[in-house]
Design a protein with these regions (language model features):
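Cytosolic ends of transmembrane helices, especially the final helix of ABC transmembrane type-1 domains
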Residues: 233, 277, 298-323
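Pre-NBD coupling/linker segments of ABC/ABC-like ATPases
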Residues: 223-236, 255
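Membrane-integrated ABC transporters
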Residues: 1-44, 63-77, 95-99, 116, ...
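Transmembrane helix-loop-helix hairpins at lipid-water interfaces of multipass membrane proteins
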Residues: 31-91, 168-198, 272-279, 283-296
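Cytoplasmic coupling helices
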Residues: 97-116, 123, 179-223, 239, ...
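Physicochemical signature of membrane-embedded alpha-helices that form the seven-helix bundle of GPCRs
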Residues: 36, 80, 84-91, 153, ...
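Hydrophobic/aromatic residues in alpha-helical transmembrane segments
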Residues: 47-54, 95, 99, 114, ...
């Protein structure tokens, strides 16, 4: 329990540090970014809702329907859907443009902080190699700090998006949404675990990767070309590369195969839960307590819940591992 609280505290410290950095870098850009994020959160739900209204309209067409009224309603919904989709694309483009500018502002802010810190240090520190190691480390990690800062903002956005989608499902049923979340978590955790395992494997075997590239560079280098031909060294170089590559390939294959088997089983759980929910939604339509539009609406909401939960856990892992 103590370790859990320590992890939560460490994660919250990262969030507060990142938010403080992004706000201090440019309050104006931060405000614009938050405003655009709000639109990014709301627009998918608006599209899902309008789509459900459109389906209800088309499903309710009958011989007794007033033709011109139906056409008018259809036109309004189609135009609304077009407007929302265009707005969604526009907001995403503006957000991407703003991220590029915001990135530059945060970068210069971090560099300025490094300079400010160095300016306040005693002169004798400049004679120490440890000082320059720290400065180089801070400079090299500045890009990573910026990446984490944007991931924190994304984490908050996906969390809010998930909460809205989850609350929408609760309006339909108080129990099944919890089962949906519980069924999705193992699959997401295993996917992240697989990525972490492959990444850790690659880090552990960087020496072997460098060995392969070094031998390849030797074989392609003019400097060694003559010796390779005179002493017939190509078979030796080739065998070294293939032996090293085969070892890496078999090891990586073993890791991915192990997690693939687990993922196959884990991916079944959310699909089964989703099918049960859709079946119950279908029954409500047949019994008359729901509409076809409701079926489409909640199907979209389920997708938002699953996608939001996946991105929350993914960004959490990226942020916490990069602390």
């Amino acid at each position: 329990m103590k370790k859990l609280f320590e992890k939560i505290k460490a994660f919250l410290d990262i969030i507060f540090f990142s938010l403080k950095l992004t706000v201090q870098a440019s309050p104006k850009y931060f405000s614009f970014y938050i405003l655009l994020s709000v639109f990014v959160i709301i627009l998918p739900f608006a599209v899902i809702y309008v789509s459900s209204l459109l389906i209800d309209l088309l499903a309710g067409v009958s011989e007794n329907s007033v033709r011109h009224e139906m056409i008018k309603s259809l036109a309004v919904l189609i135009v609304s859907l077009l407007f929302l989709n265009v707005m969604s694309k526009t907001v995403e483009s503006i957000k991407l443009y703003l991220e590029g500018l915001y990135n530059e502002v945060i970068t210069i802010k971090i560099k300025h902080q490094i300079m400010e810190k160095a300016a306040g240090i005693d002169l004798y520190c400049f004679d120490s190699h440890e000082f320059y190691d720290e400065i180089n480390d801070a400079s090299n990690n500045s890009t990573f700090i910026i990446q984490i800062s944007f991931q924190v903002l994304d984490f908050i956005r996906y969390f809010v998006q998930f909460c809205i989608a989850f609350a929408s499902l609760l309006f339909w049923n108080y129990i099944l949404p919890f089962f949906l979340v519980i069924s999705v978590i193992p699959s997401i955790l295993m996917k992240n675990k697989q990525l972490e395992s492959v990444y850790s494997f690659q880090r552990e075997h960087m020496k072997d990767e460098r060995k392969i590239y070094y031998i390849m560079n030797m074989a392609l280098s003019r400097e060694y070309a003559k010796d390779i031909r005179i002493y017939n060294l190509f078979p030796l170089l080739s065998s070294k590369i293939m032996n090293t590559w085969n070892h890496l390939y078999r090891s990586k294959k073993k890791i991915t195969k192990k997690y693939t088997k687990i993922l196959v089983a884990a991916d079944i759980l959310p699909e089964m839960t989703t099918i049960i929910i859709l079946f119950l939604l279908g029954l409500s339509v047949i019994e008359g307590s729901g509409t076809i539009g409701d079926f489409n609406y909640y199907q979209g909401i389920i997708g938002q819940v699953i996608a939001g939960l996946y991105m929350i856990i993914y960004n959490y892992g990226q942020i916490y591992d990069g602390k």
